[in-house]
Amino acid sequence: KRVPTCHRTSYDAITADEDYKLAIQYADISQKIIYEAEAKAIDEIQKGILTISQNEKPYDVFICYKETDESGKRTQDSVLANDIYHQLTQEGFKVFYAAITLEDKLGQEYEPYIFAALNSAKVMLVIGSKPEYFTAVWVKNEWSRYLKLMKGDRSKLLIPCYKDMDAYELPEEFAHLQAQDMGKIGFINDIVRGIKKVINKD
């Protein structure tokens, strides 16, 4: 038996999806039975994710970064993310930082907590020290979803934060965004100041 996995949860029901409707429209009887059964399974998973996410307290900031490299070692990005996390929490911000936020969720699905944080956070920081880290599967999964949310909520802000690379090496989706160079002295203070302007925590 196949069990669907959800890594891009939405508030919209799968049965309302246009592609799903087309698939049902053109399916034969046996295919239709399979599609409807799988849609029902996805619907149940979605309801479970939404139930958990609705009980989560809202976040101010979501830190998006690559935790480990190809050899399983901790990345420079994770060290920078950790420093930023501690500075922001000292300033009174509620921050989603996977290494700490999800550490007591071992053995559980992370998606409900990521989904809740993406939807509530007013600011996302995308940390990267290599172009390929910005486009790593899980990193891109998070920031691409956040960009989509920004289209419907103009109060949300995404700040790309880069180091040891040029700004033009950032993903083209970030071309219209103001990026932060983490190689500059005092970059964390600059980030905190920028976030305070958005969230008004003075």
Task: Give each language-model segment a name.
Residues R2, K130-P131, C161-A167:
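Short beta-alpha junction loops
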Residues M165-L177:
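Glycine-rich, charge-decorated loop segments at or immediately adjacent to ligand/cofactor-binding or catalytic sites
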Residues N141-R145:
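Glycine-rich, phosphate-binding/catalytic loops in enzymes
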